């Protein structure tokens, strides 16, 4: 099938005097375009994940670069076959990355290109730090990277404190990376505040590395926050051996699902055989739960939508009404 949609990942830190106006302009523009997205705008700038029919995506990129303050936005593009978000979401978020503390964005690590990053990996001189959540690096990461056991962005400040106690900040050079680069903009500042003298950040994140270098020193797949959930970092190299395993049978696997049990919704890795036997659930206990969303093999591992929650509620109400009649 011809891939005629684009997936765009981008962010830009810049002063935005009227975020609500930018949000309104985005929403108005998208009314007539075949797109879906999750875009956050604040006084700090913009953080966007977007998908759209190729001509509409190109129109949006040109439009945004013509907006005051956004002329230098860099878009990372993947070719896809359909929209990958459930709806158009453009909203205000005070923190573009939900860190929970203030950081000095004027004091950041040194941005290095994917090529420079690869060369430094070859040197094996620095501590390579994955600053993503644990469920992200579980299915893919750089060779020999330090993998913090954190599940939310807000846990990183405490981890930065821990890191400064485990390694001498004055003599430990750090190379940090994330999916697209925006988390490193904040996290590098935190490490500098903790006394680390030499902090590098991968410009454009893992996405840019995959596009510029290829698989290189990367192992596994890249977790993404959209319907795909996991992708190879090199579009030309899709035969990627899994580095994770099924949570039920430990078969090598890197496919994520969210639990069909409405009251769980846990994100878990599962093979094709086990996902069927457990009715799309993360455990046998969840497979016996009263509010299970219907799982069909044809839907693949696409995350459940809110409408499934509505369907479960409706079925429960209808069942209750039926009981009352007898």
UniProtKB/Swiss-Prot annotation:
Q: Which family does it belong to?
A: Belongs to the TrhO family.
Report domain Rhodanese positions: 122-218
**What reaction gets catalysed by this protein?**
uridine(34) in tRNA + AH2 + O2 = 5-hydroxyuridine(34) in tRNA + A + H2O
What name has this protein been given in UniProt? tRNA uridine(34) hydroxylase
GO process terms (BP): tRNA modification
**Active site: residue positions:** 178 (cysteine persulfide intermediate)
Organism name: Chlamydia abortus (strain DSM 27085 / S26/3) (Chlamydophila abortus)
Q: Which GO terms describe its molecular function?
A: oxidoreductase activity, acting on paired donors, with incorporation or reduction of molecular oxygen
Which SUPFAM superfamilies does the entry link to?
A: Rhodanese/Cell cycle control phosphatase (SSF52821)
> What are the top taxonomic ranks of the organism?
Bacteria, Pseudomonadati, Chlamydiota, Chlamydiia, Chlamydiales
Q: Which PROSITE patterns match?
A: RHODANESE_3
- NCBIfam families recorded: PRK00142.1-2, PRK00142.1-3
What are the entry keywords?
Oxidoreductase, tRNA processing
Q: What does this protein do?
A: Catalyzes oxygen-dependent 5-hydroxyuridine (ho5U) modification at position 34 in tRNAs.
Record's InterPro entries?
Rhodanese-like_dom (IPR001763), Rhodanese-like_dom_sf (IPR036873), Rhodanese_C (IPR022111), TrhO (IPR020936), TRHO_N (IPR040503)
- Per the UniProt entry, the Enzyme Commission number(s) are 1.14.-.-
Gene3D superfamilies in UniProt: 3.30.70.100, Rhodanese-like domain
Please name the top-level EC class of this enzyme: oxidoreductase
